């Protein structure tokens, strides 16, 4: 038979497992770590200014719109990076994940070819493929770090300075002006 204390601990455990993730607050610093589809470790506090977007398959066009709003002056600058986290909302079976990662890498290769024109015009010697980051979040661990529920259909954009301080957060694609202001503040 359960005693009152055991009921209390049972309720405490159940409550802890059902609480939503805490939303990140602008001005606070966060040492978040993600692993992209190329197995590169990306941290919000490693000296890079990071634009982090969270997208699902349904709002993928917003990620493209965000990329189009990043000012070209930041293209190829190793101090800045755009990280797209694809939230698969825990809906992909493990055997399919490798195939999906291969498809994502193929799409990144194609995007790098498009970016090569911009890099050539700006006389950048870097390989644009090295500047494109996508995190395939199959299990919800990446979005949970950002205070989002793993099954959330939400789109979000975060800008972190090089020390991991959250400069801005949006729940939609920010204007080019707002994004530029956040990047300048994050420098």
Predicted regions and their residues:
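Boundary at the C-terminal end of the N-terminal hydrophobic targeting segment
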Residues: 21-23
